[in-house]
């Protein structure tokens, strides 16, 4: 089962971002702003930066995740987000044999063709092991491993990149596994920096807040709690009409229920 754990982060990230945002509009230095910065002021400066697209200040807070038991399909999608750092389990040095060979079966295949997928995975494993026993080096034998083979990866992103990552990967149009990873990553960062990630979400949320009045901005929490909430946008950038956007977001998060 997919595991996502936040293992390291900028402890005062919210305050750092707020001070950086304030310093950009002030002649005063860090010490002056830090000593008088209140929690309410931190929230105000973060909110102002996000709702006005002042994204550069978000780069000062950094997060490292350990993401485990995912497929190579998912890890290949992760590394497409280039403003990040990655260290992945090597199948050259960490051979996926015996109990460590746990390829991922997609939920759709579990419902329809689980036996077929398991058979294909077993054949691939048997061929891989045969190649190893015949003397083929690990770096070459791994060529026959399936894309579904399980892997672990350490990922580091700053808050700005996370906002970009979430805008794309929390969307219901994202593939199920990378979407599940994104929702789990969001859960992790919200535990430590709820004010900073209050306004994140798929692109439809970001765009909606750009066209709303500041005192009418919405959050993902509003989507799941207020069933009367209506979007102003006529359609999202993926083409979903206004009346269907909220349902689309709710359906996107349901991927977490499908992988339990």
From Swiss-Prot:
Gene Ontology biological-process entries: dTMP biosynthetic process; dTTP biosynthetic process; methylation
Binding residues for dUMP: 77-80, 88-92, 142, 169
Keyword Heme appears in the UniProt entry: no
Active site: 169 (involved in ionization of n3 of dump, leading to its activation)
Keyword presence, Methyltransferase: yes
Domain ThyX: 2-203
Note on how the cofactor is bound: Binds 4 FAD per tetramer. Each FAD binding site is formed by three monomers.
Substrates-to-products reaction catalysed: dUMP + (6R)-5,10-methylene-5,6,7,8-tetrahydrofolate + NADPH + H(+) = dTMP + (6S)-5,6,7,8-tetrahydrofolate + NADP(+)
EC numbers, comma separated: 2.1.1.148
Family note: Belongs to the thymidylate synthase ThyX family.
UniProt-listed NCBIfam families: thyX
Physiological role: Catalyzes the reductive methylation of 2'-deoxyuridine-5'-monophosphate (dUMP) to 2'-deoxythymidine-5'-monophosphate (dTMP) while utilizing 5,10-methylenetetrahydrofolate (mTHF) as the methyl donor, and NADPH and FADH(2) as the reductant.
Protein name: Flavin-dependent thymidylate synthase
Organism, scientific name: Saccharolobus solfataricus (strain ATCC 35092 / DSM 1617 / JCM 11322 / P2)
């Amino acid at each position: 089962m997919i595991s996502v754990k936040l293992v390291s982060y900028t402890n005062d990230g919210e305050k750092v971002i707020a001070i950086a945002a304030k310093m950009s509009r002030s002649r005063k230095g860090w010490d002056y702003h830090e000593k008088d910065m209140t929690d309410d002021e931190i929230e105000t400066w973060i909110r102002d930066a996000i709702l006005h697209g002042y994204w550069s200040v978000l780069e000062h807070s950094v997060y490292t995740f350990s993401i485990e038991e995912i497929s190579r399909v998912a890890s290949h999608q992760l590394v497409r987000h280039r403003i990040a750092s990655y260290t992945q389990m090597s199948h050259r040095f960490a051979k996926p044999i015996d109990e460590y060979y746990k390829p991922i079966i997609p939920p759709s295949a579990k419902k329809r063709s689980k036996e077929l997928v398991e058979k294909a995975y077993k054949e691939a494993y048997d061929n891989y092991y045969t190649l190893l026993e015949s003397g083929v080096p690990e770096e070459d034998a791994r060529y026959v491993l399936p894309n579904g083979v399980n892997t672990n990866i350490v990922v580091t992103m700053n808050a700005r990149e996370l906002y970009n990552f979430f805008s794309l990967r929390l969307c219901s149009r994202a593939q199920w596994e990378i979407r599940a990873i994104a929702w789990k990553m969001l859960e992790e960062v919200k535990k430590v920096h709820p004010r900073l990630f209050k306004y994140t979400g798929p692109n439809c949320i970001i765009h909606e807040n750009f066209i709303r009045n500041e005192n009418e901005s919405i959050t993902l929490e509003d989507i799941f709690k207020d069933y009367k909430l209506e979007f102003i946008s006529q359609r999202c950038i993926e083409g979903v009409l206004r009346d269907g956007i909220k349902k689309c977001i709710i359906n996107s998060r349901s991927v977490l229920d499908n992988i339990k």
